[in-house]
């Protein structure tokens, strides 16, 4: 009997997970099609002169045991003699032996590091805890008058919440009060999306900061537990204090998975783009693929198709005439684009007050309205192995825009100069300490919850009619998934195929629970 084939469009976490699961659990042959020159999608690692760039920052944690096990099967956790770092699940200790006898990152590359989490907000040229806490430091920096206003504003919101919550502004004010919304949320969020918060549906808050509020942040501050449980099931995501991280960044995980797929007999084609999908009788029959190096097109028969490509593009390349309303909704879906300025500096002006060394933050939310930069990563603090020279500081300056914006097309040297100037303006570096830089542009990084999104179910229902087409991943579902959610959509799609389940409902239900997300 001829072996069945699955064509997988997209070599990010969802696509590679689907391919690996098919090879591990079935005799279905996967073929991964990736448009770019490397795997990983937005979870890839870029490299520049020996330094590594994690695009957007990817902490490896999940409330899913299945995902945590999957990661550690691919890349074991580093050795540690400290019991506190043992991973635990639902009160049961797991992989204690691995945690105690894992590989040494000094001698082994295929290893997960255990890293401390620290994120803060930069506002009025000062650093504040994120999530906010009523520490002496916060009180001193905010001042009693502003703090009092924030407290009264929160009490007012708690007593008279906005109902119904029509937009993101309402969502945040109901949980933090208007004063803290204006102080710590408004500027950054509007940089990310390029539109006012009152024009963004509340769905975005439900996906990215759900479960968090002033009361939970205070409870966490007062009852801090350092149990060492990296999966931390009962901790709201933005309060998690430890995470796992591949030695050379998230791309190392997905490059390793791609290698495993090829060793098991699967194929991964880089610089190949899906340009057409043939359908018949309610199913996908073939995918046409273009080799970006030669321009040659090939049509590949498919028994199953997994798509993590943007939904807008998927509807466009289907050979069937979708109803006009479906095409209109698909064409109206919007995406926010993104670029990172990698900046190597001699040192930062911000120092740890206790040690005088480099601050320990993984990333910093820039809430300053007088600069365009939205977020700053300090790659040394993600993994010391991301930096060629540990005596220098390797930064990632994150900017959000549309591909049509003028800033997107500015030459790299101008963007490097912009980033250097802005960090100097807000007191994070001395521009004279800048040594080198690069620019990484990423299209369609963030599927937007505005545009035609409120009618997205019309597109979803149409695509679900194709019995062997599975929409997975962030852009594949037009949902603001983290990488573990993207993986779960692929895992469940494979589950359905192997179990003969035709309903796609469980795939779409991933990441709809009201308890999980890192605020980004």
Question: What residue spans do the PLM features occupy?
Answer:
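Active-site/ligand-binding neighborhood in enzyme catalytic cores
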Residues: 135-138, 143-280, 285, 293, ...
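Mid-domain catalytic core of redox enzymes
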Residues: 25, 246, 270-427, 455, ...
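Dinucleotide-binding Rossmann-like beta1-alpha1 core, especially the glycine-rich loop
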Residues: 49-158
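Short loop/edge segments at beta-strand edges and connector loops
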Residues: 115, 270-272, 473
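Glycine-rich FAD pyrophosphate-binding loop
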Residues: 23-48
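Conserved Rossmann-like nucleotide-cofactor binding loop
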Residues: 14, 38, 312
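N-terminal Rossmann-like FAD-binding beta1-loop-alpha1 element of flavoenzymes
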Residues: 3-32
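C-terminal lid/capping helical subdomain adjacent to the catalytic/cofactor pocket in oxidative enzymes
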Residues: 440, 450-520
């Amino acid at each position: 009997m001829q072996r069945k084939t699955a064509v997988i469009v997209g070599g990010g976490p969802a696509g590679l997970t689907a391919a690996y699961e098919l090879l591990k659990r079935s005799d279905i042959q996967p073929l991964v099609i990736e448009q770019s020159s490397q795997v990983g999608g937005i979870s890839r690692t870029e490299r520049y002169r020996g330094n590594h760039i994690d695009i957007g920052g990817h902490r490896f944690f999940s409330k899913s045991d299945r995902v945590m096990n999957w990661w550690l099967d691919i890349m074991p956790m580093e050795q540690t003699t400290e019991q506190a770092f043992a991973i635990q699940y639902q009160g049961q200790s797991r992989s204690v032996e691995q945690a105690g006898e894992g590989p040494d990152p000094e001698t082994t590359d295929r290893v997960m590091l255990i890293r401390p989490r620290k994120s803060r907000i930069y506002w009025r040229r000062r650093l504040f805890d994120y999530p906010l806490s009523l520490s002496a430091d916060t009180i001193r920096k905010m001042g009693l008058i502003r703090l009092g206003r924030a407290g009264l504003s929160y009490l007012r919101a708690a007593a008279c919440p906005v109902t119904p919550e029509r937009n993101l502004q309402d969502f945040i004010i109901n949980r933090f009060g208007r004063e803290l919304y204006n102080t710590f949320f408004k500027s950054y969020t509007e940089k990310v999306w390029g539109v006012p918060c009152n024009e963004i549906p509340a769905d975005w808050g439900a996906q990215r900061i759900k479960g968090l509020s002033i009361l939970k942040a205070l409870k966490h501050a007062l009852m801090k537990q350092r149990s060492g449980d990296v999966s931390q099931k009962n901790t709201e995501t933005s309060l998690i204090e430890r995470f796992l991280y591949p030695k050379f960044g998230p791309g190392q995980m997905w490059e390793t998975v791609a290698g495993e797929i090829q060793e098991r007999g699967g194929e991964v084609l880089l610089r190949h783009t899906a340009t057409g999908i043939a359908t018949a009788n309610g199913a996908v029959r073939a995918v046409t693929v273009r080799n970006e190096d030669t321009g040659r097109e090939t049509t590949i028969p498919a028994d199953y198709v997994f798509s993590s490509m943007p939904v807008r593009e998927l509807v466009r390349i289907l050979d069937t005439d979708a109803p006009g309303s479906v095409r209109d909704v698909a064409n109206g879906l919007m995406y926010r684009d993104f670029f990172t300025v990698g900046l190597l500096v001699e040192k930062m002006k911000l120092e740890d007050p206790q040690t005088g060394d480099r601050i320990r933050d993984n990333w910093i939310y820039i809430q300053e309205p007088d600069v365009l930069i939205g977020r700053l990563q300090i790659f040394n603090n993600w993994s010391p192995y991301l930096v060629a020279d540990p005596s220098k500081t390797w930064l990632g300056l994150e900017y959000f825009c549309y591909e049509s914006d003028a800033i997107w097309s500015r030459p790299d040297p101008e963007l490097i100069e912009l980033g250097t100037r802005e960090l100097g303006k807000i007191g994070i570096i001395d521009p004279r300490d800048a040594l080198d830089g690069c620019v990484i542009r990423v299209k369609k990084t963030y599927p937007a919850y505005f545009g035609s999104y409120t009618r997205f179910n019309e597109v979803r229902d149409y695509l679900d009619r194709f019995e062997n087409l599975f929409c997975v991943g962030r852009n594949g579902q037009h949902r603001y998934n983290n990488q573990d959610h993207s993986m779960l959509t692929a895992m469940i799609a494979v589950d359905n195929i192997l179990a003969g389940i035709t309903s796609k409902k469980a795939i779409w239900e991933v990441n709809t629970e009201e308890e999980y997300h890192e605020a980004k």
